Amino acid sequence: MTALQELRAGVDVETIHSAPFGAELLEIVREARASARTVLFVVSDDRRAQAAAQIAEFYDPSLEILRLNAWDNLPYDRVSPTAAVASRRCAALAALAQDPEPKARLVITTSAAIAQRCAPKEALKDASLALKPGQIIAQDTLDNFLIANGYTRVPTVRDRGEYAQRGGIVDIYAPGEPEPVRLDFFGDALAVSYTHLRAHETL
């Protein structure tokens, strides 16, 4: 039984004061594993959120950890959120919307992030597209989907939210991906291999 389970069961537990930041994450990670549910961990700012993610990964490298960050602008600012911030937030929300089944997972966020409104779950599902090697999909269909969901077509992909198309090759820098992904089409079928452009490594 984890410490959090003991608290819910009314078991007498000792109180520990002045524990260093991150010590509580050991129990939170255990709780996520034991309950096979999504556990939300809220911290004060992005610096602590990043540190919490690193600590949780150290405690359980196989646990799925999602970072839900806040927008980096105010509602009435004249500038839009940066692509990096928008992509990370969208990736986390899309992962939660696509996989609602109970599972061991830790969501790390900030007080500012959870105070901001999110897109409806159905809208996030509709804006997501899963592609697999060998899948049949027309390039025009993929192109229309990317444009409809805010991707920018460019000659060479450099930032998240961009894609490039040259013949049967499509390079996409999607939210949540550490590197751009290359899709090779044979007719309307995706090739078996993906290429991470910056590393020039075929998987």
Language model: regions and residue ranges:
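A short, hydrophobic C-terminal helix/tail in secreted or cell-surface proteins
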Residues: 199-203
